[in-house]
């Protein structure tokens, strides 16, 4: 959402940035939302330009032309309660976006680490991830001056990410074991993906 800057609560933008979502001085948006954040923000629907976004946590609803509507299967209601002890214990101010989300999931009772690192290899202009097991893949990256990245998956899917200089987590989608994911940039810059 973009708002006139005097109407915007800057703390919301700072929160979005701290957990890997896109936020700035006069805007914030859901780019970078993981399933945990999507559930907490009650993001029931996703509009995409990719016909292959259906996966174990998102189902296809409808499509028209090159626009597709998907429904997230796990969404909390608009109003929900969180234990005050969790709120007090979750200090994300000195954590990177992945650790911040893992800490929140742990405080909420998750038995396992929610987001784990997958090895990747980066060279000038391209990063590669070899997926070892079926998983929903997200990527973070070092600060970059590149403004757009393109994802190419060995099963034929592609996705473009714009305004990546804003520093949000990349939603690479659900991938099966043996899939190769390439993230390319046209600036021939080395973008380290983790």
Go through each PLM region and give its residues.
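Soluble catalytic regions of membrane-associated enzymes that act on cell-envelope
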Residues: 1-194
